[in-house]
From Swiss-Prot:
<dbReference type="InterPro" id="IPR003811">
    <property type="entry name" value="G3P_acylTferase_PlsY"/>
</dbReference>
<keyword id="KW-0812">Transmembrane</keyword>
<feature type="transmembrane region" description="Helical">
    <location>
        <begin position="114"/>
        <end position="134"/>
    </location>
</feature>
<comment type="function">
    <text>Catalyzes the transfer of an acyl group from acyl-phosphate (acyl-PO(4)) to glycerol-3-phosphate (G3P) to form lysophosphatidic acid (LPA). This enzyme utilizes acyl-phosphate as fatty acyl donor, but not acyl-CoA or acyl-ACP.</text>
</comment>
<feature type="transmembrane region" description="Helical">
    <location>
        <begin position="5"/>
        <end position="25"/>
    </location>
</feature>
<keyword id="KW-1208">Phospholipid metabolism</keyword>
<protein>
    <recommendedName>
        <fullName>Glycerol-3-phosphate acyltransferase</fullName>
        <ecNumber>2.3.1.275</ecNumber>
    </recommendedName>
</protein>
<keyword id="KW-1003">Cell membrane</keyword>
<dbReference type="GO" id="GO:0005886">
    <property type="term" value="C:plasma membrane"/>
</dbReference>
<dbReference type="GO" id="GO:0043772">
    <property type="term" value="F:acyl-phosphate glycerol-3-phosphate acyltransferase activity"/>
</dbReference>
<dbReference type="Pfam" id="PF02660">
    <property type="entry name" value="G3P_acyltransf"/>
</dbReference>
<keyword id="KW-0594">Phospholipid biosynthesis</keyword>
<keyword id="KW-0472">Membrane</keyword>
<comment type="subunit">
    <text>Probably interacts with PlsX.</text>
</comment>
<dbReference type="GO" id="GO:0008654">
    <property type="term" value="P:phospholipid biosynthetic process"/>
</dbReference>
<keyword id="KW-0808">Transferase</keyword>
<comment type="similarity">
    <text>Belongs to the PlsY family.</text>
</comment>
Amino acid sequence: MSALAVILVIGLSYLVGSVPTGYLIARHVKGIDIRGHGSGNIGATNVWRTLGPGWGLASLVGDTAKGIVAVLLGRAVGVPGLELLTGAAALTGHGWSVFLRFQGGKIIATSLGVLIMLPPVALATAAAVWIAVLALTRYVSLASIIAASSVPLAFALGGVGWRHVLFGLFLALVAVYKHRANIDRLLKGKESRFSFRK
């Protein structure tokens, strides 16, 4: 497989990740820019709070699908480990979308899609951590930060190889960076708690 094909599939994965699902849903449903409402994020949590649970779930499914597609693109090329690079490219696209002038979401739902396609130890660990932290605190942001941070450790303890550990570190670092405003609000006691009602 040529280097050009590898570069092209990584670029395509970035573009897939860049599709701003929540932004497009909000534009279509209410004609609004979701970045000007609620937390200002384009992700599923803010869509849920702004437009309601149904559209929030639609945003979650769409963003998760981007991660799945990116991994499948990487595997289709047949280069070992390429699915980790295409997965990382999708996360980068979601976080810094070319369609939104390199603004974007916080990568959690797209990370879910990527992890669904990788060895299950990280997904199982991150999901358990996310559910536990959300149940205890009702802070989606805190649950997401801690869950993302558990991914590299889960891969390391699961013995799946150094490439997966490096990918997990990338995922965790980007997730924490994208949640820096949430971290500031958490420290100040100003972060909003999640409710299953709009």
